[in-house]
Amino acid sequence: MVLISMSAVAQNKPFYNEVHEFQKKDSISMPASNGIVFIGSSSLRMWTDLEETFKSYHAINRGFGGSELTNANDWIKELVLVYKPRQVVIYSGENDVASGASSAQTFDRFVTFFSNLRRNLPKAKITYISMKLSPSRAQFSDVILKANASIKEYLLKQKNADYIDIAAKMLDSKGGYRPELFQDDMLHMKPAGYEIWTKEITPYLTKK
C-alpha cells in the first residue's frame, strides 16, 4: 500500500512523464556513478549532443523543458541524487521569472535547491550557469539580471561552487542581443549558441 501511495503521489507531480522517461532509459542502461549531472530546463533538454560533447567528463543530461527551480528540487532524488554525481551543473530559473517570480523569489528558490543539493551531496561541486538574456523575453531582462547577480554573490561565499556568466557572453559589444544565436522563437538556441556555452562551461567541469 505504501508503494502504491507513493507512486500515486509521484504521478501527480508536474513533469512525471518526463522523469518516468528518464527512469525507463536508466532501466536499460544506468549511467555510471561519479559523473556530472546537468539539470534544468529546455536549454539543456534541447542540447541534444550535450552528453557527447562532454563525453570525457561522463555527463548526464537531465534537462526537462519548461521546468522551474521548484521542479528541479521536487525531482532531486530521481534526477540528481540517484546518480551519485561528483558535480551538478544547473541551468534553471528563466522559466520561474517568465512565470512571474520576482528576482528575490527566484533567488530564494535557487538557495533552496542549492541547500538541498549540498545537504545530500556534501562533496560534490555545484555549478550554476547564469540565466541567458533572449530577445523573446526582453521584458524580463532586469529581473533576470538581478537574480543572476544575487546568485553570483551567494555562490562566491560557498565552498566548492561556481557561477558561470553565460549572459554577458551572448551579447554583442554594445550589450545588445545577437539574434543569430537563437532559433525563430528567439528563445531557444541554435548550434552557435551552444558553441558559446561549450567554450564557457568546459573550464568549470571537474575530471574524475
Segments (PLM) and residue ranges:
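Oxyanion-hole/transition-state-stabilizing segment in secreted/luminal serine hydrolases
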Residues: 44-60, 69-107, 127, 131-135
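Extracellular glycan-modifying ectodomains
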Residues: 95, 111, 115-116, 120, ...
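Conserved beta-strand elements of the Class I
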Residues: 37-39, 60
